[in-house]
Amino acid sequence: MLDEFLGEKVVVDLKSPFVCLGTLSRIDEHFLELKGADLHDLRDTDTTRELYVADSVATGVKRNRKRVLIRRSEVIAISKLEDVVDE
């Protein structure tokens, strides 16, 4: 199922107070690789996860990493950025 997301801009919700947005470039047994990524620590802002992601959909991904590897065991959910709804 994750293969459907390869090459797409995605939102990765993590167990920790982090959210990551970027282009899913590779998947293996233990890691997801995102390129042009925004690894955001929600403790650094007063906004909620949902508002941060909705703002990123509206204004674009604020890249702060060329490449980031995320442990699959830390992932709660992954979705295409285009599938985020703001209703």
State where each predicted segment sits.
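Conserved RNA-binding domains used in RNP assembly and mRNA/RNA metabolism
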Residues: 1-87
